[in-house]
Amino acid sequence: MTKRTNSTLNKCLFIDRDGTINKFNSGYNYKKEHIQLIPGVEKLLSEFCKRGYKIIVITNQGGIGMGLYSHKAVHTVNRYIDQLLRENGAGIDGFYYCPHNEKDGVGKYKVNCSCRKPGNLLLEKAITDFNADRKSSLFLGDNFTDKLCADKSSIAFYPIDFRAVKTTSQGFRVEIEEYSDDLINSILAFAERLNQN
């Protein structure tokens, strides 16, 4: 990731990938054919782009650490997601991912790291790289670990009700089936309130 030398603070939307941009499946999304964008996500992200936000993905990709897929596979899928979004007026400014898996990882990947959410090492790196304004930036994710990560870096987390969640092998998560106009407007209104503070 190229570091920005611009001294201007940027509004950023930090966003999880699997389950927030593309549909979460019970396995791992490491091939292009696994990727199905959540309906309405293109509209949501294009609205943030129009408002001058940098769109930055922060994602756990522990399947690398388990030996299920490679770094190259993650880059291929990330480029594909970016391509799909750019065809619809959106796009990703930066991808940050953690390959580690403390529980099921092998070799050098079986570590308790600070970059795997809820750790915030990657988020802090992205904040630095993009000169993010913590006060006007926000984090959107489907997993409780996303909220914990955002909290550690003093980034506002869009208030998802995690009381009615699915418990999965990858944590407590809500299922975002689509970004309806009402949900998009709610997220945009939340972001706007941050800009007024």
Regions found by a protein language model. Name each.
Residues 2-56:
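Active-site neighborhood of HAD-like aspartate-dependent phosphohydrolases
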Residues 2-8, 72, 79-93, 103-139, ...:
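Asp-based, Mg2+/Mn2+-dependent phosphohydrolase catalytic module
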Residues 16-18, 60, 142, 146:
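Acidic active-site catalytic centers that drive phospho-/nucleotidyl reactions
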Residues 21-39, 64-73, 87-90, 106-114:
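Metal-dependent phosphoesterase signature
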Residues 27, 98-101, 163:
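Short, solvent-exposed coil/turn elements at secondary-structure transition points
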Residues 41, 45-84, 90-101:
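Substrate-recognition element of Asp-dependent hydrolases with the DxDx(T/V) motif
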